[in-house]
Design a protein with these regions (language model features):
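Selective for proline/serine-rich intrinsically disordered segments
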Residues: 11-13, 26, 51, 61-68, ...
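Extracellular/periplasmic envelope-modification machinery, especially enzymes
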Residues: 57, 318, 346, 409-422, ...
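Poly-acidic low-complexity segments
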Residues: 20, 50, 91-92, 145, ...
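Actinobacteria-biased recognition of intrinsically disordered, low-complexity terminal regions
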Residues: 1-88, 311-314, 765-766
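Membrane-interface helix/loop caps of multi-pass membrane proteins
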Residues: 3, 23, 52, 74-453, ...
Length: 766
């Protein structure tokens, strides 16, 4: 390549027209404005070969600056009769800042397993560009065109996302264990609907878990979901000042007041939520909106800052004031951004106030702008290599995480090493370039798609339908002709021993894990219907509401009580007994004790219900095991809670807790079995001796002394069945014992525990 060509290649691209909208809704001027609008994922189109050398670009542009400074996101919009070349200047250094932010995200994900602050920069830039787009429309007296903005934005963003999700579904079926399939199907649909962050909260995902190989390959869509939700809500704020703009009044000050108020409220909530429930706050859109507000406030204030500091753009042919200070400020911003993840304990502090650090760093680069110095950070960020990464940044964000997760799962590592990490990064760059060329760029530039609103809407709907259809079709294929698991059907191999040879089939299958949570067939009705509802409690019953029951058993407490429901069903069915599930996941029954906010009021709700239905007995778990080696205990207040039941004449079936683990027992054993290993090998890799998981003696033994002539406490200790011969194995016979790191599979409870429980309940009746 000749030297001049190399110099031009390094110098960096200027944007060309990336798409064209038809004349609909608001007319040609708004059509051009929408075309020129930029967001955090915009490209310079250099990937498609339409880059123009700097000299040619600057000769073709109008040198006239905006009265408030020609900065992307804040400068004046062209009039209907103005040449497209006079549009607001493309901020090449901000395009390069995208490359830095995305590079940080990828590097930290692949090698460090830490939060870098790069995602926060994308949220910040999204708001910066979005605000500039709508403020220019307001100040030029043009309609906001919010519906068209939504169509234009999601028409560009969703097709590459859909392609990535479809590739992930295919890779999941090929490379990942069946235990991950159902979750990934759910996340695929949630990601395409921009609801992934909410689903991750429901699934109680820990973003900062050290083992990325155990994470979902779609987990990273949480940030795109937050961004998508903001793209829907944020434009509506500008409608609040639309009438003022039509009257010719200034809109920036009212907008600053509105957005500052929202930002302050969001930041306050973010700080509180991060301190109390950081694993939820990390995915919470409300806890992230202040980052969007920060970008908007900078966009609104930048014209004044530009005017006061004498900012210029390269296209003006004039040097800015304070050139050295601008160059140093830009470098300080990049340095602060690079250092963020290294110097801060972001794993426990984000997204609280500490996220101001990466936003301030990005803001420094924005404010510094064009420095006029060859060594300025803007010059480096404006080079062609930086622009190339910026151009593929959206696709690179989409594909790098799935490639990393699939590789780590295949290799059995928690983090990639230097060499395999480089392979992951290189593969991500190549696939991102391909997705950009084959999907992203054609969709962005398609005049046909932009010509009519229904076409853009069709592209959005089709993208979502492909994902939902693929995930739903896969789910239906797996569950075709699959009956509900039978109650207490005998296993093909004895479940009181660990098989030394690989059984032909170990069940339940991974994609059936969602069916392993015990349920009852009827919603509570008739005399068993609660007088009022309670959050997170779904009252269920065995017999229909109009049935006549000989006795009633109510299951209360946490999911560790709920998991034993299948064990009592054979006895209940034979006796025509009513079984009611009033459990609440995460909340053991401890009436009379102070509870954490999530469980507050649950015990009172249970007692209110019991007073209404007057059951014969209550089944609840009374001890608590731990996954860190801490000895099993009888929680404080358990005896008092049981006494409240006995005083009401209600018998108690007090169940001993099951072992809890530091790793997912199903996935651990599944990995061994999938490689052709035996249950004995799975036990060696995943199991433990019972003395390492439970106390030597049942801590609940003293509770039997609470029994009265009218109501007794019956201890139910199923440890011999769960951990036969003193060993807690993940596979007994041809059945997986655990569905995760602390819950038994429904199939194991039915096959192995139900007979023992039946014998115990029959002895109670005798």
């Amino acid at each position: 390549m000749p030297g001049s060509d190399l110099s031009a290649w390094i110098a960096g691209p200027l944007p060309s027209v990336t798409s064209s909208l038809g004349d609909w809704l608001q007319g040609p001027a708004e059509l051009q404005a929408e075309r020129e609008a930029e967001d955090a994922w915009s490209t310079s189109d250099s990937v498609s070969g339409t880059w123009r050398p700097r000299g040619e670009a600057s000769r073709s542009r109008s040198p006239q600056p905006s009265p408030v400074g020609p900065r992307e996101g804040v400068s004046e919009e062209p009039s209907p009769t103005t040449s497209s070349d006079s549009r607001p200047a493309f901020r090449r250094e901000l395009h390069g800042l995208r490359a830095v932010a995305l590079g940080l995200v990828a590097v930290y994900h692949i090698w460090l397993g830490r939060v870098s602050g790069g995602v926060d920069v994308f949220l910040f830039l999204s708001a910066f560009f979005l605000t500039g787009t709508f403020v220019r429309r307001l100040e030029n007296g043009r309609p906001l065109g919010v519906p068209r903005y939504w169509l234009h934005t999601f028409k560009r963003l969703l097709p590459p996302s859909a392609v990535t999700i479809l590739l992930v579904l295919a890779a999941t079926a090929t490379f990942l264990p069946a235990s991950m399939w159902q979750t990934i199907m759910q996340e695929a649909v949630a990601s395409a609907a921009y609801l992934q962050n909410l689903l991750l909260v429901v699934l109680q995902v820990d973003y900062h878990a050290r083992d990325a190989g155990a994470a979902s390959p779609l987990q990273h869509f949480w940030s795109l979901s937050v961004q998508g939700q903001a793209f829907v809500v944020w434009p509506l704020l500008f409608l609040l000042v639309a009438r003022r703009a039509r009257a010719g009044k200034p809109v920036r000050r009212p907008l600053i007041a509105i957005i500052a108020l929202i930002g302050a409220a969001s930041l306050t909530w973010s700080i509180i939520s991060t301190q109390s429930q950081q694993e939820i706050a990390y995915f919470d859109t409300a806890a992230r909106m202040w980052e969007f507000a920060a970008g908007s406030l900078l966009a609104l204030a930048l014209p004044v800052l530009d005017r006061l500091t004498g900012a210029r753009r390269p296209e003006e042919g004039q040097a800015p004031r304070h050139r050295t200070l601008r160059a140093l400020t830009g470098w300080a911003g990049v340095a602060a951004l690079l250092a963020c993840g290294v110097l801060l304990d972001v794993s426990s502090m984000f997204p609280g106030w500490i996220a101001i650090w990466p936003l301030a760093a990005a803001g420094a680069v924005v404010v510094a702008g064009y420095s006029g110095r060859r060594w300025g950070v803007d010059a480096v960020l404006s080079t062609r290599p930086a622009a190339f990464i910026g151009d593929i940044s959206y696709a690179l964000y989409l594909v790098h995480w799935p490639i990393l997760v699939i590789w780590l799962h295949h290799s059995g590592q928690e983090r990639a090493g230097l060499l395999d990490g480089l392979v992951v990064l290189t593969g991500s760059l190549l696939l991102a370039w391909l997705v950009t060329r084959a999907v992203d760029a054609p969709v962005r530039r398609s005049r046909w798609l932009e010509a009519k609103p229904w076409r853009a809407l069709t592209a959005i709907a089709l993208s979502f339908a492909l994902v939902a259809g693929a995930a739903g079709g896969w789910w239906m294929f797996l569950h075709r002709d699959q009956p509900q698991p039978p109650v207490a059907e005998g296993p093909s191999l004895a479940t009181d021993e660990v098989a030394t040879e690989a059984p032909p089939d170990v069940q339940p299958y991974g994609w059936q894990l969602g069916q392993q949570w015990p349920t009852l067939p009827e919603s509570c009705s008739g005399p068993w219907e609660p007088e009022r509802g309670f959050p997170h409690v779904n009252c269920q019953q065995l017999l229909p509401g109009d049935a006549t029951a000989t006795e009633t058993i109510v299951v209360v407490g946490s999911s560790h009580s709920r998991q034993f429901i299948p064990a009592v069903l054979p006895t209940a069915t034979s006796r025509d007994a009513q079984v009611v599930n009033l459990s609440m996941d995460g909340c053991p029954f401890l009436a009379g004790t102070e509870r954490w906010p999530y469980c507050a009021g649950y015990d009172e709700y249970v007692l209110e219900y019991l007073d209404a239905v007057e059951p014969d007995s209550v089944l609840t778990t009374v001890t608590q095991a731990f996954d860190d080696g801490t000895e099993e205990i009888l929680p404080e207040g358990t005896d008092g809670a049981l006494q409240t039941l006995l005083d009401r004449g209600i018998g108690v079936i007090a169940v001993r807790d099951t072992p809890r683990w530091g790793q997912d027992q199903y996935q651990c054993a599944e990995a061994v079995i999938d490689r052709g290993g035996t249950p004995v090998e799975a036990d060696a890799a995943c199991g433990a001796d019972v003395e390492d998981k439970l106390a030597p003696e049942n801590p609940a033994a003293p509770l039997t002394a609470l029994s009265t002539p009218d109501a007794t406490v019956t201890l139910l200790d199923l440890t011999p069945q769960i951990c036969p011969d003193g060993r807690c194995a993940p596979v007994l016979g041809d059945t997986f014992v655990y569905m995760d790191d602390n819950h038994l599979t429904r199939l194991f409870v039915e096959e192995s525990l139900a007979p023992a429980v039946t014998r115990e309940l029959e002895s109670m009746a005798g």
